[in-house]
Curated annotation (Swiss-Prot):
Phosphothreonine: residues carrying this PTM: 199
Underlying gene: dnaK
Keywords: ATP-binding, Chaperone, Nucleotide-binding, Phosphoprotein, Stress response
Organism: Serratia proteamaculans (strain 568)
Protein name (record): Chaperone protein DnaK
InterPro entries listed in its UniProt record: ATPase_NBD, Chaperone_DnaK, Heat_shock_70_CS, HSP70_C_sf, HSP70_peptide-bd_sf, Hsp_70_fam
Length: 637
């Protein structure tokens, strides 16, 4: 059985880890980095770039460079969050036929799971390069507050990337695993505050140790799936745009290239202000108008940044109160606070969290890597490599159905430990009703329409009866991934209908299969491209070597041979500029054949040079011989 890898599929950065000799190891990607930017670029010549290479070309290709795609995964186009992003992202967010939020790239609509799959493929390849064997199974993390549609979409992304997703686990829970596994922590209650690039979670987790077995039980979770570092960046970008407009009278929002440069500079400035009190955002030639080029040079202090994002940090405090209340605990019951996610490096965030809990957060957990490490540990548990660890996670939101009067009736309440199963009997609202529609909802609001609709299905053929007499048993079954399966059964006739909730949004099986096939075709295209580059490089090497030998041969080479070689060289140089591998190989072979005489001359010249060098060395050695007397000295005993 191969390794089950752990992947933290982040909004801003992603990370992959494996269990190696009983320890979790974070792997370096092909660029030598332990985290990979979750950025995907579609270039003009059809290449797909992921990570740092995609980030590097973003300034010149802003419309086709996609970032923060996790904020769109499993979302409807009409969702408030998708509409907010539509107005600020440099790329185009559009509605899919099924109403989902998709992205338009080079005139084609692409689904967020398909885009995220490109990042997962890079993580998969990173692990394969390290292990030297194929990887087909993974544990992928999601924000604890992700709903059913978002979890399902993440699983779909895994499938498109060629991975069997063995388990979806919550990011704070994964961080707790990373923290608690190798420490003699005893019985403790911890709070994991996870503020990443695009999402925020708080989880209250109890770690119990009994006879050497550690149980990680999530007591409560809360959060905001649209609050993260990207929002902090946006605040700073907006401030810089307004300042520039005041100074120069020019709105940079109309210039996508300038906005891309500004995004990079704002992110860098934000990071610098975690350790410095002030920084300069200096962007020469950021744009130009009729009067000439314009430059940006704006000083930003830490205090200014804090004033811009104060309300965002405050927004993260309310879920802390709710999570503690749901867990039935007070601040004094929390023994350790763990910070996860790059945005928690901001001093203001650390201070607010410390003030709330009345204690300093721990500094021995790497906020960028802890989640991937925890995912790898869970992979080890599933593979049987890690013993004595039990993980009890919860469902973040209540699940129920719409009942008479458009009311949401919960069957499974939030923070219920999963996997779980619950049944409830309902009845008909009309006399002789022959069918019922089961409308499945997720959320905490009383009015059905105020909750997230996960889907609906019909149960037909109900036995005719007076209103309220028919007995319809509805069963909700949540698996370990937090994904919901629903069935409805007429208890009188035994007639039953079942569905695995595929949200009213989401990809259908046919779409997923097509994307899997597309990914396989891309993999084949990538392999062919690598072979073409290799063939080109060999041809270039031959061209360079042949030209050098031609120069050295001078007039010693017969004119007809020289003409034939020159012609073959020209043909190969033309072929190398093209995309036809077979053509390059054929022209390479043709050059090798006509260069026979030249090669013989070059080899003869090398042999002669070798012989001359040998003779010189021998003469040198003779000259260096020195007559000397010597005396044998016996060792003293």
């Amino acid at each position: 059985m191969g390794k089950i890898i752990g992947i933290d599929l982040g909004t801003t950065n992603s990370c992959v880890a494996i269990m190696d000799g009983g320890k979790a190891r974070v792997l370096e990607n092909s660029e030598g980095d332990r985290t990979t930017p979750s950025i995907i670029a579609y270039t003009q010549d059809g290449e797909i770039l992921v990570g740092q290479p995609a980030k590097r070309q973003a300034v010149t290709n802003p419309q086709n460079t996609l970032f923060a795609i996790k904020r769109l995964i499993g979302r409807r186009f009409q969702d408030e969050e998708a509409q907010r992003d539509k107005d600020i992202m440099p790329y185009k967010i559009v509605a899919a036929d099924n109403g989902d939020a998709w992205v338009e790239v080079k005139g084609q609509r692409v689904a967020p799971p398909q885009i995220s799959a490109e990042v997962l493929k890079k993580m998969k390849k990173t692990a394969e390069d390290y292990l030297g064997e194929p990887v087909t199974e993974a544990v992928i993390t999601v924000p604890a507050y992700f709903n059913d549609a978002q979890r399902q979409a993440t699983k779909d992304a895994g499938r498109i990337a060629g991975l069997e997703v063995k388990r979806i686990i919550n990011e704070p829970t994964a961080a707790a695993l990373a923290y608690g596994l190798d420490k003699e922590v005893g019985n403790r209650t911890i709070a994991v505050y996870d503020l990443g690039g695009g999402t925020f979670d708080i989880s209250i987790i109890e770690i119990d140790e009994v006879d050497g077995e550690k149980t990680f039980e999530v007591l409560a979770t809360n959060g905001d799936t649209h609050l993260g570092g990207e929002d902090f960046d946006s605040r700073l970008i907006n401030y810089l745009v307004e300042e520039f407009k005041k100074e120069q009278g020019f709105d940079l929002r109309n210039d996508p290239l300038a906005m891309q440069r500004l995004k990079e500079a704002a992110e860098k400035a934000k990071i610098e202000l975690s350790s410095a009190q002030q920084t300069d955002v200096n962007l020469p030639y950021i744009t130009a108008d009729a009067s000439g080029p314009k430059h940006m040079n704006i000083k930003v202090t830490r205090a200014k940044l804090e004033s811009l994002v104060e309300d965002l940090v405050a927004r993260s405090i309310e879920p802390l109160k709710v999570a503690l209340k749901d867990a039935g605990l007070s601040v004094s019951d929390i023994q350790d606070v763990i910070l996860v996610g790059g945005q928690t490096r901001m001093p203001m965030v650390q201070k607010k969290v410390a003030d709330f809990f009345g204690k300093e957060p721990r500094k021995d957990v790497n906020p960028d890597e802890a989640v991937a490490v925890g995912a790898a540990v869970q992979g080890g548990v599933l593979a049987g490599d890690v013993k004595d660890v039990l993980l009890l996670d919860v469902t973040p939101l209540s699940l129920g159905i719409e009942t008479m009067g458009s009311v949401m009736t919960p069957l499974i309440t939030k923070n219920t430990t999963i996997p779980t199963k619950h049944s409830q009997v309902f009845s008909t609202a009309e006399d002789n009703q022959s069918a019922v529609t089961i409308h499945v909802l997720q959320g905490e609001r009383k009015r059905a329409n105020d909750n997230k609709s996960l889907g609906q299905f019909n149960l037909d053929g109900i036995q005719a009866a007076a209103r309220g007499m028919a007995q319809i048993e509805v069963t909700f079954d949540i698996d370990a991934d937090g994904i919901l399966h629903v069935s409805a059964k007429d208890k009188n006739t035994g007639r039953e209908q079942k569905i695995t909730i595929k949200a009213s949004s989401g990809l259908n099986e046919e779409e997923i299969q097509k994307m899997v096939r597309d990914a396989e075709v891309n993999a084949e295209a990538d392999r062919k491209f690598e072979e073409l580059v290799q063939t080109r490089n060999q041809a270039d090497h031959l061209i360079h070597g042949t030209r050098k030998q031609l120069e050295e041969a001078g007039d010693k080479l017969p004119a007809e041979d020289k003409t034939a070689i020159e012609a073959a060289l020209k043909d190969l140089e033309v072929a190398v500029k093209g995309e036809d591998k077979a053509e390059i190989e054929a022209k390479t072979q043709a050059l090798v054949q006509v260069s026979g005489k030249l090669l013989e001359m070059a080899q003869a010249q090398q042999a002669q040079q070798g012989a001359d060098a040998g003779a010189d060395n021998a003469a040198q050695k003779d000259d260096d011989v020195v007559d000397a007397e010597f005396e044998e000295v016996k060792d003293k005993k």
